[in-house]
Design a protein with these regions (language model features):
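Nucleotidyltransferase catalytic core that binds NTPs
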Residues: 1-156
Length: 156
């Protein structure tokens, strides 16, 4: 759902764009609509997430959908050569899997080679906000994401 857009999202989109000519991103309004208890409700509005995706140079088009039924309709009405998913879906059933298989749409499962996630970001913000209240800021929270690390990765 691209909630709390972060470096991991950008890294994933960059890898996906390297494997295709035109990258279409499907953005779900709220995954809890038809999967309550399974997915988290987004912190950011669909508009905020849309604007963030729109600002990412790797994204060519964004299609917004509400339900899993809407997603399968999007998959069926778009001309797709490849569908990207997180590696966590590799051995599971998911919306549109059989349709993609039956219609020779390649399923590409990308590996997460980093620690960035929306959950990690929420936890980091929570930790820092709590630390402000108690005036105890753990150094490792800052060290892990220090500007000095940028120099190491800017060249790649």
């Amino acid at each position: 759902s691209f909630d709390l857009f972060h470096a991991g999202h950008v890294t994933m989109l960059k890898m996906e764009k390297e494997l295709c000519d035109y990258l279409v991103v499907a953005l779900q309004v709220d995954p809890t609509i038809d999967r309550p208890g399974i997915k988290n409700k987004p912190t950011q509005s669909v508009y905020e997430r849309y604007v963030q995706l729109q600002g990412c140079k790797y994204v060519d088009e964004i299609l917004v959908y509400e339900t899993e039924d809407d997603l399968i309709n999007l998959i069926k009405t778009q001309t797709l050569d490849i569908r990207f998913l997180s590696e966590e879906y590799k051995d599971r059933d998911f919306t549109g899997k059989q349709y993609c298989i039956d219609n020779n749409i390649e399923l590409h499962y990308h590996l997460r080679r980093h620690k960035y996630s929306s959950t990690e970001l929420r936890n980091r913000v929570y930790t820092l906000e709590n630390a402000k209240r108690t005036e105890l800021v753990p150094g490792e929270v800052f060290d892990q994401y220090s500007p000095e690390l940028l120099n190491k990765y800017e060249k790649s």
